[in-house]
Amino acid sequence: MSIHKVTARDVAERAGVSRSLVSMYLNRNPKVWISEETKQRIDEAIRSLGYRPNRAAQLLRGGRSHIVGVILGRISGPVASCFAESLMTRLEDAGYRVILGITRYEPERERELLESMMQLDVDALVYTLHPEYVEEPLRRCAAACPVFLAEYHPDHPFHCVRYDLGGALTQTAHYLAGRGVKRVALLTDSGGYGEREFLSVPEWEAAGMRFRSFRCGTALRPVTGIVAELRHFQPDALISFAGIDGGSLREQLGGSPLWIDSWSLPFMPLARSDGSIVPGFRAYVELLAEAFLEVMGDPGGATRDLLAPVRFLVPEERTAVREAMNNDPFFQTLGQGAVTWQCR
């Protein structure tokens, strides 16, 4: 007794639509508008018939797999899990399936996962780790599909995310000038993150402010190791980059300098246009997903930076932000101690 294999034609007959419409729906054709009621009928027909699309045939016909690969070091932490969930939600809304690869920070496993992603014919790859150890397989991936680095690595030939500091620094310069600040200490990482952008803002010089950069945050030069230098410089304000805890340094300096934290946007609750509040990190990932989708729509285009806007958290905002963060389930999973330094 032969078993009838369910086809797209069977789905079309059950849903009362044409076979071509079922095909366009399954392939997420962006040029075709389908009503929600029709989508529901097709989905119900697929479920009731147990239809399974032939991915290989879809790929041969359309030249695209509608799969995006995402490679992370781990997914157990709240930030990594929020990144993955938010990215998956937006990409799935756009008609893509997302396959996660977890490397556990093992270089050999990273290479194996990249090979697997290429065998799956992914339409794009989002890589959240440092590309140094896997640049060769990443280059081979990039020859077939867009490769996105979730951090800024300008020395590597891939699309990457760059924080847009210009507007935030200009606003901060006006804020500090209005409070009579004359000496600014820039707390940055060992690579001098943010120094170039800081120097490019003319408002610092126009307001007569002096600044000095303090590179810290490494085992050889911990944050606590610059307290004596800061006391000698006597800053009126601290601007901390790359997650450096300027709040604890401020306390060690007697609490007098203003503390401006530049690492706030990905973690601050943000208001959407409809008035709803979304966790800032989730909104940040949604911005990245929109940029990924734009580049995926033009896969042959030149490699470019995807700008992620940044704003600074000034002292007057901290109480309100603390309350919003403490009421946010995402930050409750981080634990109180992990977020206290963000909003002191």
Q: Where in this protein do the model-derived segments appear?
A:
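N-terminal helix-turn-helix DNA-binding module of bacterial transcription factors
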Residues: 1-64
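An alpha-beta-alpha
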Residues: 172-209, 299-321
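Flexible loop/turn connectors
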Residues: 228-344
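Residue-level recognition of beta-strand->loop/alpha-helix junctions
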Residues: 102, 188, 215-217
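Alpha-helical recognition/docking segments in bacterial nutrient-uptake
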Residues: 2-3, 63-66, 70-178, 192, ...
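Short, well-ordered beta-strand segments
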Residues: 69-71, 185, 260
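A generic structural signal for well-ordered alpha-helical segments
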Residues: 12, 46, 91, 139, ...
